[in-house]
Structure formats: structure tokens, C-alpha cells
């Protein structure tokens, strides 16, 4: 997973520029530059995601910590997040990860890679775990990884929760 992954939802423009269609910012990104989220990068006219499979935070949490009402009370979810965000909130409680890009230094061991199988094994360690919550930062900027992981986890009988800013 150490390699870059080509992003989904973008268009190629003249002059090797691209327009990212993942969020309403619709960033026009010149070669060598990143979008607002700090994780989607134009390399010679192809948009790549730099945070695919890269985890910055993981914890087993009570589902009640999520902004849900009466959703499997008393159960747990594996909460995980990456770096980057399409907002710049001054009050963000996870500023230290949400306002970093995938290429920025965060300290030793701050980002690590996790396969779907590894995440499934973490879910199975807690008997009352019902699934995964993609949280801590904006999960939609992690689109390719969240999509693949969510499908895998669902096929294994687990739930998926996205804690998103909705933009």
C-alpha cells in the first residue's frame, strides 16, 4: 500500500491540469500541486490520493460517541481516521491530524498502513464491535480507501459509519 493510488472522480484539463470532483470545492489542480484537502495531488495530469490506506488514529469506541441516535446502544465501533480535510475549522478538536497532508511529518509512527483484513481482525477482537466508524477527519477525502474498506467490512457482516462534515 506504500504506492500512490489514482484518485476517482476527477477530470483532465489542458496543460496537465486536473479538476477534482470529490467535493464541492472542485479544486483545479496544477501539476505538482495539491487540492484544498492536502491529500489529492496532480502528478503530470493524473490525480493521485496520498492517504490511501494511511491511518493516523484508531480506537475502539462506544458507538454512543458517534453523532447517532439509538444506533446499537451498548455496542462498539472501530474508529479510524487519516490526515487531511476539506475544511479549515479553527475549533477542530482533531486539528493535529485533520489539518495535515499525507506528506507532512507528524512524528515517528504517526501514519501507518492498514489492510482491510487487518481492520477486520481489530473488529473481531471486541465481541461487541458492530463495525467501523470513519471519523476524526473528513472521511470523504479518503474516498477510495473508505469505499473499498466499507464494501469489504459490509460483506463480512459489519456496519459502516461515516462521521462527515457533509461538504
Place the predicted regions along the sequence by residue.
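Flexible, acidic/Gly-rich N-terminal and inter-domain linker regions that tether
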Residues: 1-75
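Conserved Radical SAM active-site core
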Residues: 42-167
